UniProtKB/Swiss-Prot annotation:
It comes from Verticillium alfalfae (strain VaMs.102 / ATCC MYA-4576 / FGSC 10136) (Verticillium wilt of alfalfa). This is High osmolarity signaling protein SHO1. Forms homooligomers. Residues 44-54, 102-113 are extracellular. It is found in: Cell membrane. Plasma membrane osmosensor that activates the high osmolarity glycerol (HOG) MAPK signaling pathway in response to high osmolarity.
Length: 293
């Protein structure tokens, strides 16, 4: 499992993820400009008035860390990995900004007013980021914002845009092991349900006697049971693709689809959904490429 995660999740930073996303580019630029205004104005206010609260310096340090973290997360396409931590720090920053602004925004001196303007801009950006990073990818506001991202339409991004640590093992990609009693499995070689995981194997020459004594068939399953679990027959949900996606050629379980294509979905509880196209093709699709109708 760790090998598959490394295979899907190791990616470097790509400036195209920031430049090709209007929301990311605009919000990061405004945040950097607001921080510079607040920093310079705070220095001037501290020198001229000596009334600037010490909380301002803590906020400036916190804000530069948050802006840098947001830039890194978007550039490396690891939003799904770090969005909880980002939302927590942005909430903390917005709370402390509110306390600071309550103490300086009503000061009529020019340096304080300039500093207040910078901190107000930072507050607005923090509030927008809290909504964006705190929302699920399928949420309508976030899906609408993401629809303008040019980089997510590229071929390379379609193949590599994952959840940071790679696609988790789901029931569609890994078949669960069949449950038998110890008497039924005595003397059998138990094949691993996950490729690459070795299990202890019993001698093969003991399998024939146990087949006859327990009534288990030669395929290792009781009579009347199928060898594999088939795909679901009901697809109660409908979803619209907000990006195009090209299935990984090394994973036969994935399904390709184009932007704005309508898919039928059987289960929406996981990060990868079992879907069916209008052509009848079935497979799993990443949930952050789809929005429920």
């Amino acid at each position: 499992m760790e090998h598959s995660r490394a295979q899907y999740g190791r990616r470097g930073m790509n400036m195209g993820n920031v430049i090709g996303d209007p929301f990311a580019l605009a919000s990061i630029s405004i945040a950097m400009l607001a921080w510079v205004i607040a920093f310079i104005s705070s220095i001037v206010a501290a020198v001229q008035t000596n009334d600037l609260p010490n909380l301002a310096w803590w906020i400036l340090a916190l804000e530069v860390g948050i802006v840098g973290a947001v830039f890194f997360v978007i550039a490396s396409d690891t939003i799904q990995t770090y969005h909880v931590a980002l939302t927590a720090y942005q909430t903390l920053a917005l709370a402390t900004l509110s306390i600071l602004l309550n103490r300086i925004v009503y000061d009529g001196r020019g340096a304080m007013q300039a500093a207040s303007a910078g901190y107000v801009l930072l507050s607005v950006v923090m509030a927008l980021w809290m909504i964006y990073f705190g929302s699920a990818p399928s949420a309508s506001p976030r899906a609408y914002v993401d629809s303008f991202a040019l980089q997510k339409e590229g071929h390379g991004s379609r193949n590599t845009m994952t959840y940071g640590t790679g696609r988790p093992e789901t029931s569609t990609s890994v078949q669960p092991p069949q449950m038998y009693t110890s008497a039924q499995l005595n003397g059998f070689e138990n094949p691993s349900p996950v490729g690459g995981i070795s299990q202890s194997q019993a001698p093969r020459n003991s399998a024939v006697p146990n087949l006859n004594s327990t009534g288990v068939t030669a395929n290792g399953k009781p009579p009347g049971q199928d060898q594999e679990v088939g795909p679901p027959t009901e697809y109660p949900y409908r979803a619209k693709a907000i990006y195009s996606y090209e299935a990984n050629p090394e994973d036969a379980n994935e399904i390709s689809f184009s932007k704005h294509e309508i898919l039928e979905v059987s289960d929406v509880s996981g990060r990868w959904w079992q879907a069916r196209k209008e052509s009848g093709d079935t497979g799993i699709a990443p949930s952050n490429y789809l929005i429920l109708l």
